[in-house]
Amino acid sequence: MEVERKYDADDATALPDWSALPGVARVGAPEHRELDARYLDTPDGALASALTALRRRTGGPDEGWHVKRSLAAGKHETRWPLGPAAGDDEAIEVPGPVAAELAEIASPPFAEIARIRNSRTAYALTDAQGALVAEFVDDRVTAADLRRGVETRWREWELELGPAAPADPAPLFAAADALVLAAGGRVSASGSKLGRALGH
């Protein structure tokens, strides 16, 4: 289960001082990742109606096929290997196991609806024992809505809880909000990159 907070930031906004976050003893070195995600749905938007996103993403430690379901407690993600490469102009074929996972809410054909490229810098926020409290990522996003032919760019931050996060994350997120606001950022108006890419 992914439990995270998203923020918006201007291009020149400096990063928050995450060493001031309760429970964080060390901010790790920056790790750069180039991510390229291609999102699919049915022609009638069955996945969106079920609050589910389907993507094929390259780059980063978790590249592959992802199905993300939005739940009250956070986002539940299921992953599969990438499989054969798909060129920019080639239709993407959804692997059988992925389609089977979605069978209760959507049936083929699936078509590409958005492409999101993301230049990401990630930082591990660890406690005094070296356990991961949270991961902070600084994302510079270029997104294309393939149905409307619209491209948008923005910068956003995400703070995702790790295994060493407190059982009640509310105080941690409240402290994170304060650090972000002090740095010049703001709580995101959009719940997901895909939603923002599609103008939601």
Feature roles, as predicted:
Residues 1-200:
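Phosphate-end processing signature that detects enzymes handling 5′-triphosphorylated RNA
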